[in-house]
């Protein structure tokens, strides 16, 4: 059996870790042990925050909608109830965007939701 020297593969592995740790502070960018731990932790944070981002944006859309329907004497929950009763199936992201960029269209939706609540 021939001897296998690991220099090339080890260097390639280290290079991959250092590339991922570029921009990190202190030893975390240039010692392999610290860089490997930092890159792994960064991956954990990235995984966690990809999940968290969905919650954060949904909460933002809800806050925007609540603020947008208040001038029409509605709360967010009553507005959503009115939408479901009137059969309008537009998601919160689109509704939030309409409230900001297309106030006239949003107002028409609010009027329909209000009518469904009154009926």
Curated annotation (Swiss-Prot):
UniProt keyword annotations, A-Z: Ribonucleoprotein, Ribosomal protein, RNA-binding, rRNA-binding
Entry-linked Pfam families: Ribosomal_L20 (PF00453)
One cellular component (GO) term of this entry: ribonucleoprotein complex
GO biological-process terms attached to the record: ribosomal large subunit assembly; translation
Statement: the UniProt record of this protein carries the keyword Ribosomal protein: yes
Annotated family: Belongs to the bacterial ribosomal protein bL20 family.
NCBIfam families noted in UniProt: rplT_bact
Protein name: Large ribosomal subunit protein bL20
Protein species of origin: Bradyrhizobium sp. (strain ORS 278)
